[in-house]
Amino acid sequence: MPTYSKRKSRGSLEVSEKTNQPKFIKRSQSSETITSGETASELMQDEKEQSNGAVGSIEDEELQRLRENQASVEALSKKPESIDRELGVEALEIDNVVKSDEEKEDPNGASSKTVKARPLPAGSVHRVTTHMAPIPARSIGSHDTTTQRLIVVLDQACLEIYKVGKAKDAKYQLLNCDDHQGILKKLNRNIAQARPDITHQCLLTLLDSPLNKAGRLQVYIHTAKKVLIEVNPSVRIPRTFKRFSGLMVQLLHKLSIRSVNGNEKLLKVIKNPVTDYLPPNCRKATLSFDAPTVPPRKYLETLQPNQSVCIAIGAMAHGPDDFSDGWVDEKISISDYPLSASIACSKFLHSMEDFLGIV
């Protein structure tokens, strides 16, 4: 029988000298010579069977792997404690499980078996201690002389309404420097005198603070037109300036804003002066850049036990700081740098929270 040398290619077709039939020469890795005893059709059929067998073996391996995974999942579901051991999580003790392995009767008289509850991992349990429980914001009147708190007066606030439009379609709007530049120019007013956004920023900073939620903050607004407004600690100031403007227009027209669910007044216009609403033992100060600098925490440490403090902050772009000279005791500065009204409120808030231990 003639022999052929091994080729590098996978195989080739050659014509037999005896039968003149094409024969497929297949390369073998185990021998150096290849016999030509098989025809091309037989070899191609063998290759097809081998490929089908390889595919079948791969499918069998995949099925076997899926069966093993399913069996392991079923085993873990039957024994949940094994999952805790694998994750390294210690099971919590549950004392209020009632008859976990016994039968329990329901009110209708039927008996049913209780399902044993699986304890939660330790990391997913959030324990709330007593001091972390939120205290509802409450209004503290001037008659309360024992509760120590911070009183903030936003003085010279730019809250002024103006009738805009023609006679029939005229509407009242909150005067601001962005939308009413023509009106301000007509009234010969400075643009800095129409900045209600400063009051908006200060109210958001004050009323969102933990000090207010703990019931240790009281806020008053004294406008440039000598209108005094009392702010309820439970009020939620609108986040957008457009909605805040509409709320202020309604307040200055109706003189009060009531809550939807009750008769409680969230914002109301009260009579001057602001000192009528301060506790008798209150210490009063104004923030001024020209005054001696003292850190807010050190200033609070000079207070007497149960003594409240009232801080007057100018809610304006710029101007003199003599707006509260008639009723304050002193002027202080809390920074070596000029601060905005919102930042000044924030610094005093944080210092008062640290001083009272409010987290």
UniProtKB/Swiss-Prot annotation:
Q: Where is the site Stabilizes Arg-195?
A: 197
Q: Where does the record place a coiled coil?
A: none
What segment(s) does the record annotate as region Disordered? 1-62, 98-118
Per UniProt, the keywords (alphabetical) are:
Methyltransferase, Nucleus, Pheromone response, Phosphoprotein, Ribosome biogenesis, RNA-binding, rRNA processing, rRNA-binding, S-adenosyl-L-methionine, Transferase
Q: Which InterPro entries match?
A: Alpha/beta_knot_MTases, Rbsml_bgen_MeTrfase_EMG1/NEP1, tRNA_m1G_MTases_N
Tell me a GO biological process for this protein. response to pheromone
As for subcellular location, the record says: Nucleus, Nucleolus
Which residues does this entry assign to the site Interaction with substrate rRNA? 195, 236, 239, 243
Task: Look up the EC number in the record and give it.
Answer: 2.1.1.-
Q: Which domain of life is it from?
A: Eukaryota
Listed GO MF terms: rRNA (pseudouridine) methyltransferase activity; rRNA binding
GO CC, any one term = nucleolus
Q: Which reaction does it catalyse?
A: a pseudouridine in rRNA + S-adenosyl-L-methionine = an N(1)-methylpseudouridine in rRNA + S-adenosyl-L-homocysteine + H(+)
Q: Basic residues composition bias: which ranges?
A: 1-10
Q: Which residues does the annotation say bind S-adenosyl-L-methionine? A: 287, 314, 319-321, 334-339
Per UniProt, the ranges with Polar residues bias are 18-39
| Keyword hit for Cell membrane | no
Q: Which residues carry this modification: Phosphothreonine?
A: 33
Q: What residues bear Phosphoserine in this entry?
A: 12, 100
Quaternary organization: Homodimer.
Q: Enumerate the PANTHER family for this protein.
A: NEP1/MRA1, RIBOSOMAL RNA SMALL SUBUNIT METHYLTRANSFERASE NEP1
Instruction: Tell me which family the UniProt entry assigns to this protein.
Output: Belongs to the class IV-like SAM-binding methyltransferase superfamily. RNA methyltransferase NEP1 family.
Free-text function comment from the UniProt entry = S-adenosyl-L-methionine-dependent pseudouridine N(1)-methyltransferase that methylates the pseudouridine corresponding to position 1189 (Psi1189) in S.cerevisiae 18S rRNA. Involved the biosynthesis of the hypermodified N1-methyl-N3-(3-amino-3-carboxypropyl) pseudouridine (m1acp3-Psi) conserved in eukaryotic 18S rRNA. Also has an essential role in 40S ribosomal subunit biogenesis independent on its methyltransferase activity, facilitating the incorporation of ribosomal protein S19 during the formation of pre-ribosomes. Essential for cell growth.
For this entry, the protein name equals Ribosomal RNA small subunit methyltransferase mra1
Q: Which organism is it from?
A: Schizosaccharomyces pombe (strain 972 / ATCC 24843) (Fission yeast)
Gene behind the chain: mra1
